[in-house]
């Protein structure tokens, strides 16, 4: 059974690119959201296995959204993505309620699977 993914990013172009890439690599993209409120609502309704979550959203930051997702009855795994480097966020990634971080330029199914397998940083 394919891994079910919700993509959350305020840029439609990245959501489209990520969808194509992940579908081509065997993931089931069950939905998209463009902001934090939409992410929490969609995760509750769609119950994805993983949420691919932009760190900088128009209405909130990804760390706060990740914390809200962790409080859901069936919390998904959360992987943060950003156009910035992981080092720009310091230890916030390590202390966050997430599986880890992927730089947007490094996004691939293999990297996502690596993080879901337990590694905190794949790029």
Predicted regions: what they are:
Residues 8-9, 33, 51:
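Conserved sequence signature across two-component system core domains
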Residues 62, 93-102:
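As written
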Residues 58:
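The feature encodes the CheY-like receiver
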């Amino acid at each position: 059974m394919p891994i079910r993914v919700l993509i959350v990013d305020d840029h439609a172009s990245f959501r489209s690119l990520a969808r194509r890439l992940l579908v081509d690599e065997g993931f089931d993209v069950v939905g998209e959201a463009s902001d934090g409120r939409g992410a929490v609502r969609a995760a509750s309704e769609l119950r994805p296995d993983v949420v691919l979550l932009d760190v900088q959203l128009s209405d909130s930051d990804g760390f706060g959204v990740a914390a809200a997702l962790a409080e859901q009855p069936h919390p998904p795994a959360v992987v943060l993505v950003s156009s910035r480097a992981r080092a720009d966020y310091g230890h916030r990634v390590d202390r966050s309620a997430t599986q880890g971080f992927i730089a947007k330029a490094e996004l691939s199914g293999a990297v996502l699977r690596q993080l879901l397998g337990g590694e905190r940083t794949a790029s």
